[in-house]
């Protein structure tokens, strides 16, 4: 499980004054990665291999929060889920598939 947040500021807004979808996706991907990182074993690393995001509502101010969880963790693949909310209201949902492999950090 992971909980992270992002304060909405002018640098995140597109010309229409709405948070850029890429910023919301980045929050979701980071949150899903943090949730997976909390359960991987010693010597294991991972990377995102596929992700989908669904946007439900535009955001122009406030604080974005991301709650992520592990849906399934296999030997080599993990499926993750993230919900992004603005002031408690659901604005986007993401699902991601991550490849888990043996490797050295850094």
Give, region by region, the residue ranges found by the protein language model.
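Hydrophobic residues in beta-strands and at strand termini
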Residues: 6-8, 55, 100
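Hydrophobic residues positioned within well-ordered beta-strands of beta-sheet architectures
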Residues: 2-4, 49-51, 66, 80, ...
């Amino acid at each position: 499980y992971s909980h992270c947040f992002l304060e909405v500021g002018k640098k995140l807004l597109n010309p229409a004054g709405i948070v850029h979808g890429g910023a919301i996706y980045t929050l979701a991907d980071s949150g899903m990665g943090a949730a997976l990182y909390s359960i991987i074993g010693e010597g294991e690393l991972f990377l995102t291999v596929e992700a989908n995001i669904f946007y439900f509502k535009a955001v122009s101010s406030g604080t974005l929060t991301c709650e992520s969880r592990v849906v399934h963790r296999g030997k080599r693949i993990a499926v993750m889920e993230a919900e992004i909310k603005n002031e408690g209201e659901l604005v986007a949902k993401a699902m991601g598939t991550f490849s888990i492999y043996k490797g050295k950090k850094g």
